[in-house]
Curated annotation (Swiss-Prot):
Subcellular location, record wording: Cytoplasm
Gene Ontology CC terms: cytoplasm
Gene responsible for this protein: panB
Pathway(s) of this molecule: Cofactor biosynthesis; (R)-pantothenate biosynthesis; (R)-pantoate from 3-methyl-2-oxobutanoate: step 1/2
Name used for this protein in its record: 3-methyl-2-oxobutanoate hydroxymethyltransferase
Protein species of origin: Burkholderia pseudomallei (strain 1710b)
Length: 271
C-alpha cells in the first residue's frame, strides 16, 4: 500500500501562505499525526498540517502536552511526511526542547530531517531571540501566543488570555516581537475576538486562530476535536464537523469550506 497521492494542486509553501494572507484567502490548518490521515487531509485541500504536541492528549491520553517528547514529534512528523502532502508540514517543538537558541536549533534540525517544513514554538517577547536564531539558520518559524498549553501550570489552567487591557497590550507586544524576529506565521489561541482582530491588523504575517474569532488569516483545530472524537466537555471553540456528514473525508472538506468562506468560527466558537 502506498500513501503517495497524485495531485495537480500546487504545494503550499511559506511564501504561499503570505500570498494567501495578502489576497484575503483564508488558511485552513488541522493537526495531523499519521500517513493515512495526512493523505486524506491533503485530498481535502487542507493548507497546513500540524504535527502538534496535542498528540499527547488525543493519542497518548495525557492530561497535558507536557509529557510529549521530541522523539514523539519526530516519529509522527516522519509518518505525515511519508504521505508527501501538498500542504505545508509544521511540527511543534515540545516542552523543554527550546530553552536556549542552541537547543531550539538542535530540536528543529531533528524535526526538519524527519520532514517538517516549519517548526512551531510557544512564547512571545522572551522567545524573540530564539526565533531570530532559528530564522537566521534557515528554519521557518510559526510562533504561538495567547493561551500556550505548555504553560498550563503557570496559567493555573486553560484560560482565555488577553481579556484585560494590560493582557491585550502584552499579547500585541508578544506578537510584534516574534514577527520582528522573523516568524512567518503565528497562532493565536483562546484570545478575545476583538484582540485577535487588532493583532491581525497590526501584523504583516498570517495569523491562525483557535478560539480567536473569525478575523484571523486562518483557523486551526485538533483533528480529533473537529471529528467529534474527544472525551468530556467540548471546548467552546470546537465545532463537530462530523455531524451530518457521511464520512471523515466529507467532514474535513466541510471544515475547509467553512474556514475559506468565513462561516467558521461563528460567535458561539469565540470569546
Amino acid at each position: 500500500m502506498t500513501y503517495l497521492q497524485e495531485s495537480s494542486r500546487p504545494a503550499v509553501t511559506v511564501p504561499k501562505l503570505q500570498a494567501m494572507r495578502e489576497a484575503g484567502e483564508k488558511i485552513a490548518m488541522l493537526t495531523s499525526y499519521d500517513a493515512s490521515f495526512a493523505a486524506l487531509l491533503d485530498r481535502a485541500n487542507v493548507d497546513v498540517q500540524l504535527i502538534g504536541d496535542s498528540l499527547g492528549n488525543v493519542l497518548q491520553g495525557q492530561a497535558t502536552t507536557l509529557p510529549v517528547t521530541l522523539d514523539d514529534i519526530a516519529y509522527h512528523t516522519a509518518c505525515v511526511a511519508r504521505a508527501q502532502p501538498r500542504g505545508l508540514v509544521v511540527a511543534d517543538l515540545p516542552f523543554g526542547t527550546y530553552g536556549t537558541p542552541a537547543d531550539a536549533f538542535a530540536s528543529a534540525v531533528k524535526l526538519m530531517r524527519a520532514g517538517a517544513q516549519m517548526v512551531k514554538l510557544e512564547g512571545g517577547e522572551w522567545l524573540a531571540e530564539t526565533v531570530r536564531f532559528l530564522v537566521e539558520r534557515a528554519v521557518p518559524v510559526c510562533a504561538h501566543v495567547g493561551l500556550t498549553p505548555q504553560s498550563v501550570h503557570a496559567f493555573g489552567g486553560f484560560k482565555v488570555q488577553g481579556k484585560t487591557e494590560a493582557g491585550a497590550a502584552q499579547l500585541l507586544r508578544d506578537a510584534r516581537a516574534v514577527e520582528e524576529a522573523g516568524a512567518q506565521l503565528i497562532v493565536l489561541e483562546a484570545v478575545p475576538t476583538l484582540v485577535a482582530a487588532e493583532v491581525t491588523r497590526e501584523l504583516s504575517i498570517p495569523t491562525i486562530g483557535i478560539g480567536a474569532g473569525a478575523e484571523c488569516s486562518g483557523q486551526v483545530l485538533v483533528l480529533h476535536d473537529m471529528l467529534g472524537v474527544f472525551p468530556g466537555k467540548r471546548p467552546r471553540f470546537v465545532k463537530d464537523f462530523m455531524q451530518g456528514q457521511p464520512s471523515i473525508f466529507a467532514a474535513v472538506e466541510a471544515y475547509v469550506r467553512a474556514v475559506k468562506d468565513g462561516s467558521f468560527p461563528g460567535p458561539e466558537h469565540s470569546f
